[in-house]
C-alpha cells in the first residue's frame, strides 16, 4: 500500500520553523519552533487487532508503516512530534511506549496524555474535527465496529 498521499510536504522557514502541507489538498501551515504534532498510539500508530490487546498487560500492536513514515518525515525535517496516548496516564507505561517507538525506528519521542496550546495538529483514529467559525465537521477516516 502506497502512503505517498499521507506524506507531508515540508519546507524550512528559518528561523521560525517549517512550512508543512500535511495533505495535498490543504494549504501549507507554518509549524513554528515550540509547536508540536501529536499522534495517538493505539489504532493510529499501532494496530489494535493483536491478541490480548484489550487485556492486561495491554501489549502494543504492530505498527502501521504508513503512519511511521509520516512521523519520520516530520522528525527528519525538525518538526517536534509527540506520542499522545491515554497509556501515559500511568507513568509506568511511558517507558514501554518509548521502547516501542525506538524498536520501530522512531527514535526518542516524548510521550504524553496532556494537550497544551502548542499542539498544532493531532492524528487519531477516533477523532472528529470541529472547525469554528462555521459548522464544518470532519468525520474520522475509519469507523469502529461494535
Give residue ranges: language-model regions.
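HAD-like aspartate-dependent phosphatase fold
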Residues: 2-146
Amino acid at each position: 500500500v502506497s502512503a505517498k498521499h499521507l506524506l507531508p510536504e515540508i519546507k524550512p522557514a528559518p528561523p521560525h520553523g517549517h512550512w508543512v502541507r500535511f495533505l495535498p489538498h490543504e494549504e501549507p501551515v507554518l509549524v513554528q519552533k515550540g509547536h508540536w504534532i501529536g499522534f495517538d498510539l493505539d489504532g493510529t500508530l499501532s494496530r489494535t487487532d493483536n491478541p490480548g490487546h484489550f487485556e492486561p498487560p495491554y501489549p502494543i500492536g504492530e505498527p502501521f508503516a504508513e503512519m511511521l513514515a509520516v512521523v519520520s518525515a516530520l522528525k527528519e525535517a525538525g518538526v517536534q512530534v509527540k506520542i499522545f496516548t491515554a497509556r501515559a496516564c500511568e507513568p509506568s507505561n511511558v517507558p514501554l511506549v518509548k521502547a516501542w517507538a525506538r524498536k520501530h525506528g522512531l527514535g526518542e519521542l516524548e510521550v504524553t496524555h496532556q494537550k497544551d496550546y502548542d499542539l498544532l495538529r493531532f492524528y487519531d483514529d477516533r477523532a472528529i474535527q470541529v472547525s469554528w467559525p462555521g459548522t464544518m465537521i470532519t468525520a474520522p477516516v475509519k469507523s469502529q465496529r461494535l
